[in-house]
């Protein structure tokens, strides 16, 4: 009896884990929209879709004016959503052992400074702060954003290397490609690679801001495409995580 029970238990342990039932779509939408990042990424998609439409070709003057007004309004709305967001970067640095690694300081510190400065950019664009402060604030913000992405990409490339090593180790241990552990690692690897693509796209836009759109970085189609790609990847990640 004990042997049979053990065999049954062993057989049960080899069965693939049961997948949770699919979530109700509207409940999922509610959870997504209750997140600050969820709404922000929908606004980002809207903004860069409008920019891409403007860059794609000549539009009737009335339609072009409406799209430009919409794009500008959405951009200002997104900055309002960043109020206090720098606190998450402060907490991320606090979670690291002291002193934090240089690359973590670059990633979280750069992004934190960017979000902190963006609050003042928003106040200047909204008219509360003097308009003459805006160019300097935007330049400092763009540099902080770019440095943050350099650190973030570096960290994620290191994590990709570790995940690839873990997959190879599992396969050497006899795990098959279709096993749950390998499939889970493959999914994490894919998501991490997508995150790097997103950061590269955002870094290209930040570099365009830093260089005042000189050369290829002055292409409105390239910048709009990079922004839309980043927004879609981020929206996908947020949707899957909520």
Curated annotation (Swiss-Prot):
It is found in: Peroxisome membrane. It is a multi-pass membrane protein. The keyword Membrane applies. One of its GO terms (cellular component) is peroxisomal membrane. GO terms for molecular function: identical protein binding. Belongs to the peroxin-11 family. This is Peroxisomal membrane protein 11-3. The lineage of its organism: Eukaryota, Viridiplantae, Streptophyta, Embryophyta, Tracheophyta.
């Amino acid at each position: 009896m004990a042997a049979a029970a053990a065999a049954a238990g062993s057989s049960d342990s080899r069965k693939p884990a049961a997948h949770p039932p699919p979530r109700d779509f509207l409940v999922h939408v509610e959870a997504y929209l209750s997140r600050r990042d969820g709404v922000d990424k929908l606004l980002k998609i809207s903004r860069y879709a409008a920019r891409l439409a403007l860059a794609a070709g000549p539009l009737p003057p009335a339609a072009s004016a409406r799209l430009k007004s919409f794009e500008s309004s959405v951009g200002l709305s997104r900055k309002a959503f960043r109020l206090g967001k720098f606190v998450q970067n402060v907490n991320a640095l606090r979670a690291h052992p002291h002193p934090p690694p240089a690359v973590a300081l670059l990633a979280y510190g750069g992004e934190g400074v960017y979000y902190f400065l963006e609050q003042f950019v928003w106040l200047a664009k909204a008219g509360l702060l003097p308009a003459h402060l805006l160019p300097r604030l935007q330049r400092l913000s763009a540099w902080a954003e770019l440095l943050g992405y350099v650190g973030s990409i570096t960290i994620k490339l290191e994590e990709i290397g570790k995940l690839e090593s873990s997959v190879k180790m599992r396969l050497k241990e006899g795990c098959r490609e279709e096993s749950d552990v390998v499939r889970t690692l493959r999914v994490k690897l894919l998501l991490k690679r997508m995150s790097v693509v997103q950061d590269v796209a955002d870094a290209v836009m930040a570099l365009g801001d830093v260089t005042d759109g000189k050369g290829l970085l002055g292409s409105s189609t390239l910048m709009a495409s990079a922004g839309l790609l980043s927004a879609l990847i981020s929206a996908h990640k947020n949707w899957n995580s909520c």
